[in-house]
Amino acid sequence: MMDTPIIRHPEKVRRPDNPSPRKPEWIRVRAPVSHEAAEVRQLMRSKNLFTVCEEAACPNIGECWKRRHATFMILGDICTRACAFCNVRTGKPGHVDDQEPVNLADSVVAMGLKHVVITSVDRDDLADGGAGHFHRCITEVRSRAPSCSIEVLTPDFRDKPQGALARVVEAGPDVFNHNLETVPRLYPTIRPGARYFHSLKLLDRVKTIDPGVFTKSGIMVGLGETREEVLQVMDDMRSAGVDFLTIGQYLQPTLKHVAVDRFVTPDEFKDYADIARGKGFLMVASSPLTRSSHHADRDFEDLRKARQDAAATK
């Protein structure tokens, strides 16, 4: 008997296909076919771990896995949200794997990581949204790999107790990332389970809990936003004290996902970067293939140096 194929997005199955424009020549990526990539994949399977690299169909997976870098996705591979842009499976999640913090730390040690990025699916089914599990993962990695810097990319903990966010921040990540993803006008169609100003307030609260932690947020472009809306998001992020901004091109995972409205040119990305630096961000990454965790290890070193340089000029 053949296994029933997994339907990753049951809520999208009945939708008509949404063809996107053809990708331009500046969007070219390599498949994850290197020996190093095979080793990373095998390690993840052996430790029962998931990566956002695979689950979200990241275009940079070939490059990152060749460098033996991966972004760990905790709390399972099934999300309780159904964002229009995301390739992660939607449905009813299973139990939380209590062994995951240990397996995660084992993998960080085995890969010799100097910087690790930990993200998760949304777990609206959990009382704390998974905050306690984030705390345990951070603590375990810190214990097993004390020289490894830790970056978290969290969900919004919407409708969860105030202490949920504090639980994550107080575990002591070096970088706290929460992506706004798009401009507020597009939230009802692109990110219907979230609220723009809630996410913005979350980033602001992180700095209140720990003023020393680096905060980071990103958006996708090519979804139908205007230039003026992108600049307003930059201003909103700076008002919330965000240190590091990432801007990348939205790429459609399947024909059932929202279509690409347009492909933003490399020159436009450069223009956004120049404007953002002028608004006071410590760091900006803006290019067609920029993703939240792409080159996160190198970016963390640059981020620390940027803060030191800024302090020296005051």
Curated annotation (Swiss-Prot):
Residues that coordinate or bind [4Fe-4S] cluster 1: 53, 58, 64, 293
Query: What Gene Ontology terms describe what this protein does at the molecular function level?
Result: 4 iron, 4 sulfur cluster binding; lipoate synthase activity; metal ion binding
Q: Which UniProt keywords apply?
A: 4Fe-4S, Cytoplasm, Iron, Iron-sulfur, Metal-binding, S-adenosyl-L-methionine, Transferase
Which residues are involved in binding [4Fe-4S] cluster 2?
Answer: 79, 83, 86
Q: Which InterPro entries match?
A: Aldolase_TIM, Elp3/MiaA/NifB-like_rSAM, LIAS_N, Lipoyl_synth, rSAM
Q: Looking at the record, which segments are called Disordered?
A: 1-24, 294-314
Query: PROSITE patterns attached here?
Result: RADICAL_SAM (PS51918)
Record's GO cellular component terms:
cytoplasm
Q: Its principal location?
A: cytoplasm
Start and end residues of each Radical SAM core domain: 65-282
What does the record's cofactor remark say about binding? Binds 2 [4Fe-4S] clusters per subunit. One cluster is coordinated with 3 cysteines and an exchangeable S-adenosyl-L-methionine.
Membrane-crossing residue ranges in chain numbering? none
Q: Where does the record place Basic and acidic residues bias?
A: 294-308
SMART domains assigned: Elp3
Catalytic reactions of this protein: [[Fe-S] cluster scaffold protein carrying a second [4Fe-4S](2+) cluster] + N(6)-octanoyl-L-lysyl-[protein] + 2 oxidized [2Fe-2S]-[ferredoxin] + 2 S-adenosyl-L-methionine + 4 H(+) = [[Fe-S] cluster scaffold protein] + N(6)-[(R)-dihydrolipoyl]-L-lysyl-[protein] + 4 Fe(3+) + 2 hydrogen sulfide + 2 5'-deoxyadenosine + 2 L-methionine + 2 reduced [2Fe-2S]-[ferredoxin]
SUPFAM superfamilies on file = Radical SAM enzymes
Kindly list the places in or outside the cell where this protein is found, as annotated in its UniProt entry: Cytoplasm
Pathway, per Swiss-Prot/TrEMBL? Protein modification; protein lipoylation via endogenous pathway; protein N(6)-(lipoyl)lysine from octanoyl-[acyl-carrier-protein]: step 2/2
Which cofactors does this protein require? [4Fe-4S] cluster
Record's CDD domains? Radical_SAM
What are its E.C. numbers?
2.8.1.8
Q: What EC class is this?
A: transferase
UniProt record similarity statement: Belongs to the radical SAM superfamily. Lipoyl synthase family.
- Provide the protein name: Lipoyl synthase
Q: Which organism is it from?
A: Rhodospirillum rubrum (strain ATCC 11170 / ATH 1.1.1 / DSM 467 / LMG 4362 / NCIMB 8255 / S1)
Q: What is the lineage of its organism?
A: Bacteria, Pseudomonadati, Pseudomonadota, Alphaproteobacteria, Rhodospirillales
